[in-house]
């Protein structure tokens, strides 16, 4: 009866339950889109969640590792984070102040300072080269005083707002022909130590402390996406007496094992020596890691303080002519990036972070990415998640998308960052209190590598995928999972063996991944203080729990992401306020997308374009027609459509439903992506 009432109310409001199917190659019409760029200036209280941060950053002492997690003197700490890439790390002082304030409003409490050591430009994509932290004097060694001053002022602003930093050291200096050689090249090793010393021991005039002694630093990464076990197989790192990768399988087992040990020792010695240098010579106290786990074998990382990983759903093929696979991860019944990369490479006993993650623009479904990651990161008990990237350019306040990975102007994604912060940082999504720990001894990893030599991080996923079902995708989606590198394989026989099904729900009952209708997947989060739907409604009523239900009308993609966050954390029936966000099709003004065809001339789900068809700001978006049923009394509930700054723009009528409960009907007529709800 409840569903019948909901359908009736929605139809009386003039809604449509027919979802427009996103067929292969379809590019929706821009008709009805409106400009909406979330403000870079002052914002209204309704969209300011900076109270989730504990300012100033570092007031409770240095972050350290205890019992496999990050803690400070106050207790456990999670890093709800983003990245700044390349010249975006060097804003003017005025821009730095606005940037720090804006990030804090979205509940971001850490920023990864990434790719500062090389001009980010034509080597990556056809845009003008911008400054790095090194002076343009040909030395590639001297820090640029102006860029260093800008960076240090930015860090001071972050600290004041309660935002920590992750210092990413070697990324792209000398570009990629040196990748991997730092494991055995003394000259490169010396330059890495020199850069670390210059950057970490310089006294910041705005904080009075060098980074090595400043608790604003949360963690330090030695290298980005760089490991001997990967670069050897890519062909750009090989000593004259080493076999070629193609020759490995032909060698006797003893020689293969000896070569594995050679690579393992070279790499682990380098990481351990750099960690010791930072600790003993520079006085660094915070956790240190080497590189991402997907780039090497776990035995090479044993000496590090925590583990880190990266993942992208449908990473674009970049160039003047680019291509993007335009598919929604919610339609992958196998778990997408979560089970394919992130969960099976989480090793037990140490903190785990994901310092880069994105569903890159112009994916029409990009808004699903961060909510799905943050919900599962909270459930899995991870220690940090970093949206990649806040910005990649020196234009710190873009009005549109300037690159595939930036979030600063990506309205459809950014508006849900508040729900992400509530789920992960505030802990509104509960962690699995028990979890499972499949055993995968380091010796097993080595033995599998000998039979099928490949880049290091792929070995763990290979073993996970060939298990007997006790380390299956379903296990990882239903239970907190951490691979025990020192465990007894006999333990694996006692783990639950999950059976396949179209609906996967976490053991806590708060997260549901539903593929009952193929091609119309749904991802739902049901907690007392955060409700989330992302996917293809297909005319269904979404019961989000605690008296909250959602019905979505016709959208341009037949798809939407909707989040509802309680500001006070007291639920949606009690006195207080909440933020409702509903997003859909969003892209640059005047963007031109081309539908790709396969070799047989059939349309595919890939979209592509040329850089000069990329379009410009402002971001154009659609308003989502939906009916939201709340547990609060209609007589005590008010709702307002908000403008780009979060200020009240127009009141939304609240209707009285069954038992006097509140019913909201939102839609494109309000020309907004977010709404404030108040219960008195």
Spell out what each predicted region is.
Residues 15-19:
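Sec/Tat signal peptide C-region and signal peptidase I cleavage site
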Residues 20-59:
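N-terminal pre-domain segments of enzymes
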Residues 56-304:
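Active-site mouth of glycoside hydrolases
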Residues 270-287, 296-314, 326-480, 485:
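Catalytic-core region of carbohydrate-active enzymes that cleave or remodel glycosidic bonds
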Residues 625-665:
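Proteolytic-maturation and junctional protease-sensitive modules
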Residues 659-680:
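C-terminal beta-strand-rich structural cap/linker in extracellular carbohydrate-active enzymes
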